[in-house]
Amino acid sequence: MVQKKYCEAIHQTERRPTRIVNVGNVGIGGNHPIRIQSMTTSSTRDVEATIEQVIRLADQGCEIVRVTVQGIKEADACEHIKKGLIKRGYQIPLVADIHFYPPAAMRVVDFVDKVRINPGNFVDKRASFKQIVYDDESYAREIERIEEKFTPLVEKCKRLNRAMRIGTNHGSLSDRIMNRYGDTPFGMVESALEFARICRKNDYHNFLFSMKASNPQVMIQAYRLLTQAMYALEWDYPLHLGVTEAGEGEDGRIKSAMGIGSLLIDGIGDTIRVSLTEDPWHEINPCQRLIKLASAYQQQGVAPFIENYRQIEAIERRQVHLSSTVPMHRDGTVFISLPINMLKEASLYQQIGCEGPFGKPKLKTATADNLVLKNPNSDSEEKRQLQILKDLGIGLFSKDPFEMSLVIHPLKKWLQSRAVDSFASRFSSSWAKSAGQPLIIQITDETEKEWKEVISLKPQLIILSPSTNRLHYSRQFFEWLQQNQLNYPVILNFTYQGENEDTILLASMECGSLLCDGLGEGVWLEGPYDILFLRQLSFSILQAARLRMSKTDFISCPSCGRTLFNLQDVTKRIQSRTSHLPGVKIAIMGCIVNGPGEMADADFGYVGSKPGKIDLYVGKECVEKDIDFADADDRLVNLIRAHGRWIEPQTVNA
């Protein structure tokens, strides 16, 4: 089935055309550059503190700033914040973030440039996650109720020339939407379209959409489904991109880059925010880097091709055959290049992810699965160390024949030998020397015509190593594999050269886009970086793509004026006690608004309920309420233990 259109082109990056939405003096969409946004963490009632944060963000390069508006007092504070900014020479647009309370939106729209509403809770109550049956008639009545409550805001925004963002979050869909569409990207899209139809009915068009989730795969799918719907409807509204509750540090940047960057390479997105559990100005540099990296993709790509197999409506991992003769992990395999001289280094085990004294290593959950040896030789000490690693279960590979490793054969060399009309020249190559070994082929920049050799060679593994246009070339190759019903596993072998920060983002964008589409059985990242960096990045990418969970996954909101405790300090404290629990997902939320709903992907939740009090969740269910802040960390650990997910730190194999 041919893929329904969701972007301008699948073979190259071409920005999706949109109308222009004006937010104060800043235009979004059209031919405007991709805009950078952030959000203050101060109490909105603290006018001076909020002004200072907005100014600091603007000075860092932020173009639009959002503040939380829970009620009328916060709405009134926005008048003074806006005036204070103008008095100090800052015309940066101000956005009010609204949840649950339409009167606050009606008040604050007098003072700000844009209002963000959440269609999941603007009119509907907080989801109870209960089964509720809606027939068509009762469902229609609910839509009428939404229209009655929402239309006054639409009319006022239109009259005052204010902008609006209809911002759906995966975790805060209404009971009504979930009972008809499920807790799915399809529900996210329909939730937003309901509100957009009301805007259009009132001839109001100065709005844009967002589809945020803490899971990058869900987020990517939701945005693609939305653009697919807009192409079908012939709508052209801009999009604000973001992964909500991405967390902090490298993991937060990886999740954000995977979600935001994947869409930017598709040409989707007009404004972005990297939501980090850090001071808000730390979000600006990753945004700037993402935009720069995505811009380099503009008009880059491969020859046009038609996709029949990659479907955005139902994402499934490609079905492959894993040979018992090639070491592979079913949830995603990590290859690492290893210079042969590293075998004598004391830091070897730390670099590849083992533990234990030198000569007696032990595997951990993030130990490299396979090592690709550079310039292997017959040094006895090095061979002894290799045998130790091999006995441990780590696969050894090389690009040249070596007695202890499996050989990776470049398809280019095979084609060159085929071009020479000599039986001897073909079989004097490394292909013959690997007789009896599984066949592992490396594809670089060969053409589709040259790929056909793969059919007759029947490899057990393919290393995919395009040097340019990595994403589009890889998509085209996977489509060709599917068309020819070839179920060979494929490792994404991408080489990078930039700064560490850029490589973290670009590798997450490129590998993440493919992995989130179910394409690729692992990663092999290369470049002028230390092995530890590449290994940790590889495992983090697999985890962010929800393939292989090698460490605790933290879902933490970026904090805002609603937050009831110091989110950064609490997050670090909880991480220090629970970071040894691979596969466990823990959400740390500053308030009830960003609590049970927004942490839809978590196993356990730690949520501020009122000043000095914490609620604990298992999934979406609140199991302990109003715990004293001082006791909450211990109670969280006890809760994890009670559900059989706790491992003592000294015994964990992580």
UniProtKB/Swiss-Prot annotation:
Disulfide bonds, paired cysteine numbers: none
GO biological process terms held by the UniProt record: isopentenyl diphosphate biosynthetic process, methylerythritol 4-phosphate pathway; terpenoid biosynthetic process
Pathway(s) it belongs to: Isoprenoid biosynthesis; isopentenyl diphosphate biosynthesis via DXP pathway; isopentenyl diphosphate from 1-deoxy-D-xylulose 5-phosphate: step 5/6
The keyword tRNA processing belongs to this UniProt entry's keyword annotation: no
Enzyme class: oxidoreductase
Keywords: 4Fe-4S, Iron, Iron-sulfur, Isoprene biosynthesis, Metal-binding, Oxidoreductase
Cofactor binding: number and manner: Binds 1 [4Fe-4S] cluster.
Protein name: 4-hydroxy-3-methylbut-2-en-1-yl diphosphate synthase (flavodoxin)
Organism: Protochlamydia amoebophila (strain UWE25)
Chain's gene name: ispG
